[in-house]
Amino acid sequence: SNRPMPLNIYQFKNMIQCTVPSRSWWDFADYGCYCGRGGSGTPVDDLDRCCQVHDNCYNQAQEITGCRPKWKTYTYECSQGTLTCKGRNNACAATVCDCDRLAAICFAGAPYNDNNYNIDLKARCQ
């Protein structure tokens, strides 16, 4: 499917590059049961748990009328590895920005296990 990438994903990607400059953001695009495409089963490790929390955060953001987290752009700043969501965001943007900010910080603190990249979702994420 050649759909455009949701706008917010670019911002989330840049946030990840702010907190984890040593890794490609692609390393997080298909990891465990929750990072990227998945969303079921038990998280395989702490990093995968970061993504589960991020998914849940987006689900909560969707409760805000008209809020579509994957498409919502927001205002933020990256300074020396520190992320700040800026005050110009409305309720939806502020919530989504915080979801992404907390996930990017979570990624920076979680060990990366190469064995959990591109796993078999059917086998391991029931």
Curated annotation (Swiss-Prot):
Location of this chain's protein in the cell: Secreted
Record EC number: 3.1.1.4
Propiece residues: 2-7
Tissue specificity note: Expressed by the venom gland.
MF GO annotations: calcium ion binding; calcium-dependent phospholipase A2 activity; phospholipid binding; signaling receptor binding; toxin activity
Signal peptide residue numbers: 1
Active-site residues (renumbered): H54, D100
PROSITE patterns recorded: PA2_ASP, PA2_HIS
Entry binding sites for Ca(2+): Y34, G36, G38, D55
SUPFAM superfamilies with a match to the protein in the record: Phospholipase A2, PLA2 (SSF48619)
Main location: secreted
Reactions that this protein is recorded to catalyse: a 1,2-diacyl-sn-glycero-3-phosphocholine + H2O = a 1-acyl-sn-glycero-3-phosphocholine + a fatty acid + H(+)
Quaternary assembly: Monomer.
Annotated function: Snake venom phospholipase A2 (PLA2) that exhibits strong anticoagulant activity, which is not due to the catalytic activity. PLA2 catalyzes the calcium-dependent hydrolysis of the 2-acyl groups in 3-sn-phosphoglycerides.
Official protein name in the record: Acidic phospholipase A2 4
The species this protein was found in: Naja sagittifera
